[in-house]
Regions:
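Classical Sec-dependent N-terminal signal peptides that target proteins to the secretory pathway
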Residues: 1-18
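Domain-level marker for long, solvent-exposed, non-transmembrane regions
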Residues: 17-188
Length: 188
């Protein structure tokens, strides 16, 4: 009886160890997947920042203009991609809100607001990056100016939407702001 109990206990312990090992392997695979994804993102950002550094170098006047334009194009594209999903999501949720509170005009205003913040942030951020070689505070100014653009956009857009639509749009705007700040953080 005692031997069978010990065998049973041994089997239970063995099964627990195997289950734990399988779980650890799953966690490791997920961790590796995430790290690989992050590494790719970091490599992309390193290349992106290398181009910005190249563009802002004081002794490369001939190449500066074209490299800076390329950086500006990339920054604008990134922001537009971030915004595109948010605008589409807002449009998809239109049916959840009363038509008079959240109509096509409102959606158009939101889209225009996003384009406005993109244009303001790109021009301000690029200017500060291009000046950073002669001003150590250039990148901080870029982030500050981009923050102003985001804050202006959120304030202006919220003011133009009726209250019940604002409540539904808040999460989307907060997500946009978070992603925008994360973009700045990864590129400062």
């Amino acid at each position: 009886m005692m031997i069978s109990s010990m065998l049973f206990l041994g089997m239970v312990m063995f099964n627990n160890v195997m289950a734990q090992t399988a779980d650890e392997l799953r966690q490791k695979r997920e961790k590796d997947r995430v790290e690989k994804s992050l590494k790719q993102a970091c490599d992309d950002d390193d290349q992106y920042m290398a181009e910005i550094g190249y563009a802002t170098s004081a002794d490369r006047d001939d190449a500066e203009a074209s490299a800076l334009l390329n950086c500006q194009r990339k920054l604008k594209l990134r922001l537009e991609q971030t915004v595109k999903g948010v605008v589409e999501d807002l449009a998809a949720k239109q049916e959840l809100v009363s038509q008079d509170a959240y109509d096509a005009i409102t959606l158009r205003k939101i889209n225009q607001g996003f384009q406005s913040v993109i244009n303001k942030s790109v021009s301000r951020t690029i200017k500060c990056y291009s000046d950073s070689w002669k001003n150590d505070k250039g990148q901080y100014e870029a982030e500050y100016n981009a923050k102003i653009s985001v804050d202006e956009f959120i304030r202006e857009t919220k003011a133009g939407i009726k209250e019940d639509a604002v409540l539904r749009a808040n999460i989307q705007m907060d997500n946009f702001e978070k992603e925008f700040r994360e973009h700045l953080k990864n590129n400062d």
